[in-house]
Amino acid sequence: MAKIYRETDADLSELKGKVIAVLGYGIQGRSWALNMRDSGLRVIVGVRPGKSRDLAKEEGFETYDVAEATKMADVVAVLLPDMVQPKVWTSEIGPNLKPGALVIFAHGFNIRYNLIKPPSNIDVTLVAPKAPGKAVRDEYLRGWGVPALVAVHQDYTGKALRRALAVAKANGFTRVGVIETTFAEETETDLIGEQTVLVGGLMELIKKGFETMIELGYQPEVAYFEVLNEAKLIMDLIWERGVYGMLNGVSETARYGGLTVGPYVLDNSVKERMRKAAERVRNGEFAREWLNEYEGGMKNLSRMLNEVKNHRLEVVGEDLRRLMRSGR
């Protein structure tokens, strides 16, 4: 059974008098910085000159270059894009960390695949909200929060978990619940979920359904509504009620058809391919492939994005979305 930490398991006094540097001021970084400041903590922002730094200044933060912010900080939240982190770590973060500093990542990718190798005299932890950055801020302001994961990779001070939980509490995560995990589990499940279900799986399922209906002679606009537009309604039901609750929220015809035809379309061969995709994540093959793609200028990614952009599903969808917005 998973260990879940809540409000009474975390103490903000662990961070009293400490300087917290949020590195990066994108959607996630901004939300963390604002939340922790509103929780009474001293927060500075490390970010390069540009629009993000200007925004941080406008919102009342002391801003510094990443290296300078790291030097000043007792707690360093690394909220830069994953693929930017290793280079910035080598040149600006790693050489400037105080002994005993707490470093927090929001995703375990670079630690899991040894792209960042931290020194032995710091604490290294993970605090990973399971929601987009905007929701992290919005739910905090609502007096609630979003669920998160916490993990300890390195505990130099003996206080790594306590301090990470304090950061989680300052962001509102312990109001909902913070699940203890490992860097490996967080990273692998995140990638496997994205590839096989959330991004890759859903996208391809919708595309294949759309293509099938078009090939059978149905109107593209009608097919779009059936396979994409209504997918949100079903996912909302699943999110609110679970899969069983969703089934009780649709018609008996939909319920029977889904339960009998769904396993035929997505049979155990799909699960076998999911396992193969998962193994590529677990053995590092996907990480190596993605790193090569990134360092090579992401030409394959650009090509694939253009293919999606020009797919008939997107062309039809753009027109229909414009039509639906026109009445607002």
Curated annotation (Swiss-Prot):
Entry EC no(s): 1.1.1.86
The source organism is Caldivirga maquilingensis (strain ATCC 700844 / DSM 13496 / JCM 10307 / IC-167)
Encoded by which gene?
A: ilvC
Which cofactors is this protein said to need? Mg(2+)
Similarity field? Belongs to the ketol-acid reductoisomerase family.
Name the record gives this protein: Ketol-acid reductoisomerase (NADP(+))
The residues that the entry says bind Mg(2+) 2 are: 190, 226, 230
UniProt GO MF annotations: ketol-acid reductoisomerase activity; magnesium ion binding; NADP binding
In which pathway does this enzyme or protein participate?
A: Amino-acid biosynthesis; L-isoleucine biosynthesis; L-isoleucine from 2-oxobutanoate: step 2/4; Amino-acid biosynthesis; L-valine biosynthesis; L-valine from pyruvate: step 2/4
